[in-house]
UniProtKB/Swiss-Prot annotation:
Leader sequence segment: none
Residue ranges annotated as Extracellular topological domain: 251-444
Subunit structure: Homodimer.
One Gene Ontology cellular component annotation held by this UniProt entry: plasma membrane
Family: Belongs to the EssB family.
Domain of life from the UniProt record: Bacteria
Keyword Cell membrane: yes
Taxonomic lineage of the native organism: Bacteria, Bacillati, Bacillota, Bacilli, Bacillales
UniProt protein name: Type VII secretion system protein EssB
UniProt subcellular location: Cell membrane
Known role: Component of the type VII secretion system (Ess). Required for the secretion of EsxA and EsxB.
Length: 444
């Protein structure tokens, strides 16, 4: 049997795999960002790994260094709700999600930068906002967001969540002040500050919550059997909840007792006991005071074998008012969490503590019997290069300073020499003038 030739069907067959391929490419672009190395200064390459560090404000990511670029792969999964999805939520839920966007303003107080836009914004299952693309100030885009720009974009997001006909880009680019919408949208636009905007959203959210609680109820017609099993289930759940709360209570008590025990040892200058007491505590969950106690105790015990002057200098830097990340660094270092210590030191841009953490990491690699020779060589080279990079930069700064001082001294010597020559010429000229006057007197 001979089949009829149908060009339309053949065209559809050809387009189908192309469409699937294009969809795959689109997903790849959403899940991946590529940054050319040519757009980054070589001395900033080591900072790029900050883009894969876990942060409550960003989607988890993995950084891969290629020959000519850095690739960032984002872990976007079913636990992440895109901004566009909240448009279908109930009004009270929508307001709750929108109200939480204010948390992203905290990013402006860190080294990170981000983009506040619908296609860049996701939410966790708890409704907390997380951004996709992140940058580093003065290192890699995006540029920092000013307070005014953050407020403008925040307003545009709120309006777009309730009015799907509006374009976010158009609102941000100048149409926000000209927008004529509902009284709710007008109030959003009129908010002059972030606090006023969030206060208004919170007010609307509370009204919606009250309305739902007063006017809505869910009633089901069920039989006695269902009620019986519900009662049994609730009783079981209550017992489990009480057991969990009891466990949590005693865990917290035990944790607090250890903190207090460490403090008492610190007051007695028993620094070794402080380290032993805090040995397996999670530094990220400790307050600043506890971190200070550990940091000072660690330096006092001189586990690193530091010279006296170096030790005293570090002790002067460790105070109750020190940066919390700086104090956390010493706990991570003391507990052997060297990768975390290196990340913190790099983030703080402190060469002294970065070198100390790198030296400890190299010793750890050297003494790790589980590593193969190839892996040990690879790891050693990786961290040696980072250490040498810091040493080279410090030497360059030192050489430039010495050269500058030498040039200043040379210029000073030349100035003194010129002054001496001028004084000598003045004296010679004065002597000649004197001799001329004497000669003139004799001729009279």
């Amino acid at each position: 049997m001979v089949k009829n030739h149908n060009p339309k069907n053949e065209m559809q067959d050809m387009l189908t795999p192309l469409d699937a391929e294009e969809a795959a490419k689109t997903k790849l672009r959403l899940d991946m960002r590529e940054i050319p190395k040519s757009s980054i200064k070589p001395e900033h390459f080591h900072l790029m790994y900050l883009l894969e560090q876990h942060s409550p404000y960003f989607i988890d990511a993995e950084l891969t260094e290629l020959r000519d670029s850095f690739q960032i792969h984002y872990d976007i999964n079913d636990n992440h709700t895109p901004f566009d999805n909240i448009k279908s939520f109930t009004k009270n839920e929508k307001l709750r999600y929108l109200l939480n966007i204010k948390n992203l303003e905290e990013v402006n107080r860190t080294r990170y930068t981000f983009v506040l836009a619908p296609d860049e914004l996701f939410f966790t299952r708890d409704g907390l906002p997380i951004a996709k693309t992140r940058g580093l100030q003065n290192v890699v885009d995006p540029l920092p967001v000013s307070e005014a720009e953050f407020l403008t974009r925040y307003k545009a997001l709120v309006i777009c969540a309730f009015n799907e006909k509006q374009s976010f880009d158009a609102l941000v680019e100048g149409n926000l002040e000209l927008h004529k919408g509902t009284p709710f949208e007008t109030k959003v636009i009129e908010a002059a500050t972030l606090d006023l905007l969030t206060a208004f959203l919170d007010e609307q959210y509370q009204k919606q919550e009250q309305d739902y609680s007063q006017n809505y109820a869910y009633v089901r017609k069920v039989g006695h059997t269902v009620f019986k099993w519900v009662a049994i289930g609730m009783t079981t759940l209550s017992v489990l909840l009480i057991a969990f709360l009891a466990f949590l209570y005693f865990s917290v008590m035990k944790h607090n007792e250890r903190i207090e025990k460490g403090y008492q040892a610190f007051v007695k200058d028993d620094y070794t006991q402080v380290l032993n007491t805090y040995d397996d505590l999670d530094g990220k969950k400790l307050d600043k005071e506890a971190l200070y106690i550990y940091a000072k105790s660690y330096i006092q015990t001189n586990k690193q074998g530091l010279e006296k002057d170096k030790k005293e200098n570090l002790l002067n830097n460790v105070t109750p008012n020190s940066n919390k990340d700086y104090l956390l660094y010493w706990m991570e270092l003391g507990q052997g969490h060297l990768d975390e210590a290196i990340n913190i030191a790099t983030y703080l841009d402190d060469n002294d503590i970065t070198k100390l953490a790198l030296i400890n990491k190299l010793n750890e690699i050297k003494n790790n019997g589980d590593l193969s020779n190839d892996k040990r060589s690879e790891e050693t080279k990786k961290y040696n290069d980072k250490l040498q990079d810091i040493l080279d930069k410090e030497k360059q700064v030192k050489d430039e300073k010495a050269k500058s001082e030498e040039e200043k001294a040379k210029a000073k010597d030349e100035k003194l020499k010129q002054q001496e020559e001028n004084e000598k010429k003045q004296k010679e000229q004065a002597q000649k003038d004197k001799e001329k006057r004497q000669e003139a007197e004799r001729k009279k």
